[in-house]
From Swiss-Prot:
GO terms for biological process: phospholipid biosynthetic process. The keyword Lipid metabolism applies. Belongs to the CDP-alcohol phosphatidyltransferase class-I family. Keywords: Cell membrane, Lipid biosynthesis, Lipid metabolism, Membrane, Phospholipid biosynthesis, Phospholipid metabolism, Transferase, Transmembrane, Transmembrane helix. NCBIfam families: pssA. It comes from the Bacteria. It is found in: Cell membrane. This is CDP-diacylglycerol--serine O-phosphatidyltransferase.
Length: 237
């Protein structure tokens, strides 16, 4: 059965994401953490392109969705969990192993839930923090420590706790913004230009601030909604 060559194009981005994820694992296993971490960030870019290319070329398919999920497990599940383990987790023996394994398991659950709820969920938000965002937050911590050296003693335990938190957030019902259907205007265009300029000047710091704000936004929004629900219940009681 002949295959439309256009269908190969978005899947090429997905395959490239798997390749970078595997390269990240290889670099992490040889303790070249900076390269390993930036390869995960590069995988994030490819992950953002494959779906958009598929929609632009009208080549979305069930195979592409499943292939993308498998790629995400490798690039954003296995790769960052092994980076975290080889960087800090091994100091804690089986606890470090368990934390790294749980991150992958929660990420896989997050992806499976996303795949079965794609047609029914809110197109403007994700349920649970996306696994690519969680992965990038992990590797940004490693990159920041490689530059500023803040992971020492008890802060290493905090790093492992942070990884567990990210795993829980992936399978939670906390909603996070989905940037797939952004309505562009002049104000947003200017903000994106400013952000890209900051990334050009200080890529690590700019990405860390942006991802940190993204993480906190979902939690604060959830807390606000919980307080609002409790207030409304008390008011009606």
């Amino acid at each position: 059965m002949p295959i439309n060559p256009l269908y190969l194009f978005p899947n090429l981005f997905t395959a490239s994401s798997i390749f970078l994820g595997m390269m990240s694992i290889f670099y992490a296993s040889s303790y070249q953490f900076v390269m390993a971490c930036w390869l995960v960030v590069a995988s994030l870019i490819l992950d953002g392109l494959d779906g958009r290319v598929a929609r632009l070329t009208n080549t979305t398919s069930k195979f592409g969705i499943e292939f993308d999920s498998l790629a995400d497990v490798i690039a954003f599940g296995v790769a960052p969990s092994l980076i975290a383990y080889f960087y800090v987790g091994y100091n804690f023996g089986r606890i470090g192993m368990a934390v790294s394994a749980l991150f992958v398991i929660f990420g896989a659950i997050r992806l499976a839930r996303f795949n079965i709820s794609t047609n029914t969920s809110d197109p403007y938000s994700f349920i649970g923090i996306p696994i690519p965002a969680a992965a990038v937050l992990v590797v940004l911590c490693v990159l920041l420590d490689n530059k500023y050296h803040f992971l020492e003693g008890n802060t290493e335990k905090l790093f492992l706790s942070f990884i567990v938190l990210l795993g829980v957030l992936m399978v939670s019902n906390i909603r996070y913004p989905n940037f797939k259907k952004v309505k562009w205007n002049l104000k947003l265009f200017i903000l994106v230009l400013i952000f890209l300029s900051l990334v050009f000047v200080r890529p690590l710091e700019a990405l860390s601030v942006f991802m940190g704000l993204y993480l906190i936004y979902g939690i604060i929004r959830w807390l606000f909604l919980m307080v609002k629900i409790i207030f409304n219940k008390n008011k009606s009681a």
